[in-house]
Amino acid sequence: MKPIISPSILSANFAYLANDIEMINGSEAGWVHIDIMDGVFVPNISFGFPVLKYVAKLAEKPLDVHLMIVQPEKFIPEVKALGARIMNVHYEACPHLHRVVQQIREAGMLPAVTINPATPVAMLRDIINDVYMVLVMSVNPGFGGQKFIEHTIDKVRELRELITVTG
């Protein structure tokens, strides 16, 4: 599978958000990555659906919506209404992950799952064949500009092996 570049708009300057989206539109990026944080699952708040609607109007690339929130399943209809191609939820935020993945797929989006640096890749064994993509966090979620956590490279290798073994 060809790697897909999905630049995040988390650090965008909101005064120039349209310019940043236009830059992504003109790039080789495959998607626009949007991080949504609720201040509960992670200790920070990003932006909400009014900003996402604005981004969706401007973006020519598919939206990759990464929910760092509790109960992400409650927002499946809103994420779908934005026209998102991918809805990415955290393993750690979903006690019924398989159900959430099914709901995302039934809504017509590609389900993706994220794991935090401390979460073992083996936790994805039962769900790996049901998701389009896995995001391995290389920092603890909630803040930009953190130092890269070295052992996450090993997690990517473990994930590749899990995908190879399970098909």
Question: Where are these predicted regions, by residue range?
Answer:
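Conserved N-terminal beta1-alpha1 strand-loop-helix module at the mouth
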Residues: M1-N88, C94-H96, Q103-E106, L110-P111, ...
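Short, hydrophobic beta-strand segments that form beta-sheet elements in well-ordered domains
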Residues: V113-I115
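Short glycine-rich anion-binding loops that position phosphate/pyrophosphate groups of nucleotides
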Residues: V139-P141
